[in-house]
UniProtKB/Swiss-Prot annotation:
Protein's UniProt name: Cytochrome P450 26B1
EC assignment: 1.14.13.-
Cofactor: heme
Localization of this protein: Endoplasmic reticulum membrane; Microsome membrane
Keywords: Endoplasmic reticulum, Heme, Iron, Lipid metabolism, Membrane, Metal-binding, Microsome, Monooxygenase, Oxidoreductase
Taxonomy of the source species: Eukaryota, Metazoa, Chordata, Craniata, Vertebrata
Residues holding heme: C441
One example GO MF annotation: monooxygenase activity
Gene that this polypeptide is encoded by: Cyp26b1
Major place of residence: endoplasmic reticulum
Length: 512
């Protein structure tokens, strides 16, 4: 018994020694990791590097960021201020909040900073995209792509977008069970991007398969750039390869078939615009361009669409006020008689309260956290040096949350954007859901158009209710969305705002 007791004590002592050694090793390695990045400060500048933590060697604070969500930024902002350092997705990073700080970064493009997304995003989106280009190449690409989002182009997309949304809402209402709004919003925006924006005639089964692959692609755009079996980065690369093959097939089929078209889609405009600027696009450039267009139209718009539905659920008075505006303009048409082309751009621009609702959704629930830049030369920000070679991420969502121009920032209040209040009129960098400067989101007008049409159709044709006891919490990666997707039951409404019976709904669906 004595020897057995001694053996147990010895084993426990060995285990304790191992734990102490591991703890010390982690502490020492973490301290060396901090010193390694502290040594990169620009010694010619007397200002200190921003405060913050670089986390653990190699992985930095990526784990904390993924687990804490919005709490990651807010907790560190409270501890370190509006400018702090961290290490995310395999790179050192300085995160920046506040209108004046963000303004300096956005207006310093090409002089102080240059765009550089995390390595995973650069590789997966491809080298020929607008997002990954810089300097003159970026300027030229924006000129080519800008025609896709012109007023004339948006007017031509509008009837098709409205029809896709009408069909989708009718399908949602015909479901006997609640739907996962975020997942279905992704399907909707993917269908809109592929069928309407790009004009691809992909069979329904192939479209469904392509959607599943695209989900895998989007989920891993922001991942640790470690190319190992079963890693998110590897899954993203595999998804990109499958998508590129599918897109090439669709592009070739589309280029060979020019009959029966009643409008110019984005791919037509892109090809024509590139020719006008003296450069015919290669197949690889077309594949990267279409992949970027789908990415831009898909993930962020699905996020904003889900947020719109959730806020209309939470605030029935807002939905009723929206219906009153539509009724006054003769646009509360009901779902009993679906038709294409009842909306025009001038009609939508005249709906002031609708515009306020969309603006407030984008303020409070901005789909993306911010934008990435690489520092070209050391500069000062909020009393700190931002060293050359470091990466900077300006935070859109946190700038909205801390903007002094907005009253009760956590309250969903569309009227803050009304003409009577115009809380956003003082300083354009307090409100920037689509970024700013020379890299303002090219597709912002298409995104707002889609959200407005969705809101009009929701108010006109649907009654919807939350299928769970409470609203879900929100996560931020890869874009803002509810953790459970938001479970909602939809019911169709007729032209008198009366609920359509299930058998009538089935008959309507069968005729479409």
């Amino acid at each position: 018994m004595l020897f057995e007791g001694l053996e147990l004590v010895s084993a426990l002592a060995t285990l304790a020694a191992c734990l102490v050694s591991v703890t010390l090793l982690l502490a020492v390695s973490q301290q060396l990791w901090q010193l390694r990045w502290a040594a990169t400060r620009d010694k010619s500048c007397k200002l200190p590097i921003p405060k913050g933590s670089m986390g653990f060697p190699l992985i930095g604070e990526t784990g904390h960021w993924l687990l804490q969500g919005s709490g990651f930024q807010s907790s560190r902002r409270e501890k370190y201020g509006n400018v702090f350092k961290t290490h995310l997705l395999g790179r050192p990073l300085i995160r920046v909040t506040g209108a004046e700080n963000v303004r300096k970064i956005l207006l310093g493009e090409h002089q102080l900073v240059s765009t550089e997304w995390p390595r995973s995003a650069r590789v997966l989106l491809g080298p020929n995209t607008v997002a990954n280009s810089i300097g003159d190449i970026h300027r030229n690409k924006r000129k080519v792509f800008s025609k896709i989002f012109s007023h004339e182009a948006l007017e031509s997309y509008l009837p098709k977008i409205q029809l896709v949304i009408q069909d989708t809402l009718r399908a949602w209402s015909s479901q006997p069970e609640a739907i996962n709004v975020y997942q279905e919003a992704q399907r909707l925006t993917f269908r809109m991007a592929v069928r309407v924006l790009l004009g691809f005639s992909i069979p329904e089964e192939d479209l469904g398969n392509l959607f599943e692959v695209y989900q895998q692609f989007v989920e891993n755009v922001f991942s640790l750039p470690v190319d190992l079996p079963f890693s998110g980065y590897r899954r993203g690369i595999q998804a990109r390869q499958i998508l590129q093959k599918g897109l090439e097939k669709a592009i070739r089929e589309k280029l060979q078939c020019t009959q029966g078209k009643d409008y110019s889609d984005a791919l037509d405009i892109l090809i024509e615009s590139s020719k006008e600027h003296g450069k015919e696009m290669t197949m690889q450039e077309l594949k990267d361009g279409t992949l970027e267009l789908i990415f831009a139209a898909y993930a962020t718009t699905a996020s904003a669409s889900t947020s719109l539905i959730m806020q209309l659920l939470k605030h029935p008075a807002v939905l009723e006020k929206l219906r009153e505006e539509l009724r006054a303009q003769g646009l509360l048409h009901g779902g009993g008689c679906p038709c294409e082309g009842t909306l025009r751009l001038d009609m939508l621009s005249g709906l002031r309260y609708l515009d306020c609702v969309i603006k407030e959704v984008m303020r409070l629930f901005t789909p993306v956290s911010g934008g990435y830049r690489t520092v070209l030369q050391t500069f000062e920000l909020d009393g700190f040096q931002i060293p050359k070679g470091w990466s900077v991420m300006y935070s859109i969502r946190d700038t909205h949350d801390t903007a002094p121009v907005f009253k009760d920032v956590n309250v969903f209040d569309p009227d803050r954007f009304s003409q009577a209040r115009s809380e956003d009129k003082d300083g354009r960098f307090h409100y920037l859901p689509f970024g700013g400067g020379v890299r303002t989101c090219l597709g912002k007008h298409l995104a707002k158009l889609f959200l407005k049409v969705l809101a009009v159709e929701l108010a006109s044709t649907s009654r919807f209710e939350l299928a769970t006891r409470t609203f879900p919490r929100i996560t931020l990666v890869p874009v803002l969305h509810p953790v459970d997707g938001l479970s909602v039951k939809f019911f169709g409404l007729d032209s008198n705002q009366n609920e359509i019976l299930p058998e009538t709904e089935a008959m309507l669906s069968a005729t479409v």
